Every structure is written in C-alpha cells, then in structure tokens.
Amino acid sequence: MGRSLKKGPFVADSLLRKVEKLNAAGEKPVIKTWSRASTILPMMIGHTIAVHNGKAHVPVFVTEQMVGHKLGEFAPTRTFKGHIKDKKGGR
C-alpha cells in the first residue's frame, strides 16, 4: 500500500534543505545521507547522493528514471557470496 497523496512523498528535511541549497548555488558535490527511506524527487536529478548501507556510503547518481523510488533501493545492504558447492558429490 502506498503513501497517501494528501501527505506527499517522504524526504528527510536535512536532505531536502541540502539539495535546495545546492540547486540555488548551482553546485553538485556529493551529498552524504543516512536516510534510505527518502523518496527521490525531480529536483535531485543530476546530484550524487552517498547513501549509507550499514557499513559505508554508496554513491548513487540520480537519473530521471529513479524519480519516485527510495534512495535505499540503490544501495544494497547485503552481499551475495554465492551458494557453496555440494560436498557429497566427490564420493
């Protein structure tokens, strides 16, 4: 179930302020954030946002196709090492 239209999309206030300030200045440095639940808005297109995955900040370059998705979708938290080979096969 999605979020109510009357409420609007969730974006962390600190992240929103940083993006608006950089858009006004015309700068595009990397923005560091821990807010994985923030929705990507059209004003964020072209910015690189470093999203925390629990261990490190993963740089995410925001494109037009990402608008409406959450920042956490683009910073995976788990690394898949692969399945182990069957140990019984050698008998």
From Swiss-Prot:
Does the record's keyword annotation contain rRNA processing?
A: no
Which keywords are on file for this protein?
A: Ribonucleoprotein, Ribosomal protein, RNA-binding, rRNA-binding
Q: InterPro entries per the record? A: Ribosomal_uS19, Ribosomal_uS19_bac-type, Ribosomal_uS19_CS, Ribosomal_uS19_SF
Tell me the SUPFAM superfamilies matching this sequence.
Ribosomal protein S19
Q: Which GO terms describe its molecular function?
A: rRNA binding; structural constituent of ribosome
One Pfam family matching this protein: Ribosomal_S19
**Metal-binding among keywords:** no
Q: Name one GO cellular component term.
A: small ribosomal subunit
Q: Which GO terms describe its biological process?
A: ribosomal small subunit assembly; translation
Entry's family note: Belongs to the universal ribosomal protein uS19 family.
Which NCBIfam families does this one have?
rpsS_bact (TIGR01050)
Its biological purpose: Protein S19 forms a complex with S13 that binds strongly to the 16S ribosomal RNA.
Protein name stated in the entry: Small ribosomal subunit protein uS19
Q: What lineage is this protein's organism placed in?
A: Bacteria, Bacillati, Cyanobacteriota, Cyanophyceae, Synechococcales
